[in-house]
Amino acid sequence: MAHKKGVGSSRNGRDSNPKYLGVKIFGGQAIDAGNIIVRQRGTQFHPGAGVGLGRDHTLFALVDGKVEFSTKGPKKRRTVSVVAEA
């Protein structure tokens, strides 16, 4: 017989770190090339002109300019573009 009661561990006690997702630069704001516009899981926003798509679906500026959000196509696909300022 055991002299001590067996102590079970609870199955809680874990929490993941926040991922800080979302839009970082909003429409009409100026941006430099290389800066992050949107951090996302999957393509909620699709890259347009002047915008690149990272390995984790992060959208970033390829050129300096102003950020523009638009909705295109029959599926109402949201795209992000960077319009270079002259």
From Swiss-Prot:
GO terms for biological process: translation. GO terms for molecular function: structural constituent of ribosome. This is Large ribosomal subunit protein bL27. One of its GO terms (cellular component) is cytosolic large ribosomal subunit. PROSITE patterns: RIBOSOMAL_L27. It comes from the Bacteria. SUPFAM superfamilies: Ribosomal L27 protein-like. Keywords: Ribonucleoprotein, Ribosomal protein. It comes from Xanthomonas euvesicatoria pv. vesicatoria (strain 85-10). Belongs to the bacterial ribosomal protein bL27 family. Disulfide bonds: none annotated. The lineage of its organism: Bacteria, Pseudomonadati, Pseudomonadota, Gammaproteobacteria, Lysobacterales. InterPro entries: Ribosomal_bL27, Ribosomal_bL27_CS. Pfam families: Ribosomal_L27 (PF01016).
